[in-house]
Amino acid sequence: MSQALSPAKTPKIGFVSLGCPKNLTDSELLLTQLSAEGYETSKTFEGADLVIVNTCGFIDEAVKESLDTIGEALAENGKVIVTGCLGARAGETGGNLVKEVHPSVLAVTGPHAAQEVMEVVHTHCPKPHDPFLDLVPGGFGEAGIKLTPRHYAYLKISEGCNHRCTFCIIPSMRGDLVSRPVGDVLKEAKALFEGGVKELLVISQDTSAYGVDVKYRTGFWDGKPVKTRTLELVQKLGEMAATYGAWVRLHYVYPYPSVDDIIPLMAQGLVLPYLDVPFQHSHPDVLKRMKRPASGEKNLERILRWREACPEIVIRSTFIAGFPGETEEEFQHLLDFVREAQIDRAGCFAYSDVEGAAANELPGMLPMELREERRARFMAVAEEVSTAKLQRRVGQTMQVLVDQAVGLGKKGGVGRSYADAPEIDGVVHLLPPEKFSKTYKVGDFVKARIVGTQGHDLVGVPV
């Protein structure tokens, strides 16, 4: 009597994603490929056949978190593949930093290395044989597994950066700018909208430079020519989003003159009037030491023009306080800039050495106490500006995208307006609907009248 063969155990992969949204999209790509090949994911290190850690390596805190996570995975599992930005960093002896600290990891790759990672996975954890899955063509889907909630997603349009800012080591880890074909980007965007995404967050290392590397060559989408350039891409994304009743939000936008052409699209309502612009500083001399691609005076003039063309525009930015050689006068210039530009949302880091960054060799390194003191002073001014702008929202009616619903949507909720990007900005606390028949549902848009503020957040009631 023949005995049926027991099915082979499906390999399980543990996965940890650390760092920024750009890293998150790399993780989504890997998870999509793992799923397409028949692997399952494990929620614990112990329950996995091996673990992949996608690391961040930009600042010291991120390096420590990544190394600690790798150590934890090794202790609880023993088989670990490391990928991401930290994988590209050299250690004290000139070798790979991860290998120096954790020599027992199976393999180390840099960022954006899905094929390399999959080859290591195949070596140490052969993919399951499935006669049906084996018929599926290889490659990555347009909109595979997402690590964000279903109603919003990140859309990465390029990889790498052509700038050589002295405080940054990202080009050494992620390379020069490589723009995705415009047709591929739009294809993924459509798949995301078709899948229920209500907010598309456009990301890259330098969104404004999209297409520079390919000399803005003409691509094709839906049988029609489209230039590989930020303006044309944003216009197409906005038009597409409008047909689905969705939002498009722009991140990591360097303040090039070409950005001026995008502001009218915001004024027309085609894309959200929101710009995430990494200014880093305002004083011309500091910007020169940073090797930033813009001057402080032009930045202020540009912002004022943007606000004139689109009064509703919200500007988020990040800054560095205590950069090597920064004088008190230069720092005061930065504080004045934040007030005059009326930066809606601002974050600030006290300058810290990043191994491999050119800024480490600059003269005039300031004591850490002074750097931290300036960061605190900056944040006090930034919060003054932000608080005043939030207060002016009281009485307005705003469209809010619901992120959380309490008590089946009858006891209130939490959402965001056009002025709030997920995780980095404030939220709108939604009070319970006055009519019992009304409920909040995650991923829905609601109209809310703003009745108050709460720290960095707003409070609204449905209308």
Curated annotation (Swiss-Prot):
Alphabetical list of InterPro entries matching this protein: Elp3/MiaA/NifB-like_rSAM (IPR006638), Methylthiotransferase (IPR005839), Methylthiotransferase_CS (IPR020612), Methylthiotransferase_N (IPR013848), Methylthiotransferase_N_sf (IPR038135), NA-bd_OB-fold (IPR012340), Ribosomal_uS12_MeSTrfase_RimO (IPR005840), rSAM (IPR007197)
Keywords, in A-Z order: 4Fe-4S, Cytoplasm, Iron, Iron-sulfur, Metal-binding, S-adenosyl-L-methionine, Transferase
Keyword presence, Iron-sulfur: yes
Intracellular or extracellular location(s): Cytoplasm
Cofactor(s) needed: [4Fe-4S] cluster
Cellular component terms per the entry's GO annotation: cytosol
Enzyme Commission numbers on file: 2.8.4.4
Cofactor note: Binds 2 [4Fe-4S] clusters. One cluster is coordinated with 3 cysteines and an exchangeable S-adenosyl-L-methionine.
Domain Radical SAM core: 147-388
One Pfam family named in its UniProt record: UPF0004
MTTase N-terminal domain residues: 11-126
Domain of life of the source: Bacteria
Protein residues bound to [4Fe-4S] cluster 2: C161, C165, C168
Any Gene Ontology biological process: tRNA modification
Primary localisation category: cytoplasm
Domain TRAM: 391-463
Binding site for [4Fe-4S] cluster 1: C20, C56, C85
Reaction equation(s) it catalyzes: L-aspartate(89)-[ribosomal protein uS12]-hydrogen + (sulfur carrier)-SH + AH2 + 2 S-adenosyl-L-methionine = 3-methylsulfanyl-L-aspartate(89)-[ribosomal protein uS12]-hydrogen + (sulfur carrier)-H + 5'-deoxyadenosine + L-methionine + A + S-adenosyl-L-homocysteine + 2 H(+)
Molecular function via GO: 4 iron, 4 sulfur cluster binding; aspartic acid methylthiotransferase activity; metal ion binding; protein methylthiotransferase activity
Similarity field: Belongs to the methylthiotransferase family. RimO subfamily.
Function, as annotated: Catalyzes the methylthiolation of an aspartic acid residue of ribosomal protein uS12.
Protein name: Ribosomal protein uS12 methylthiotransferase RimO
Species name: Acidovorax sp. (strain JS42)
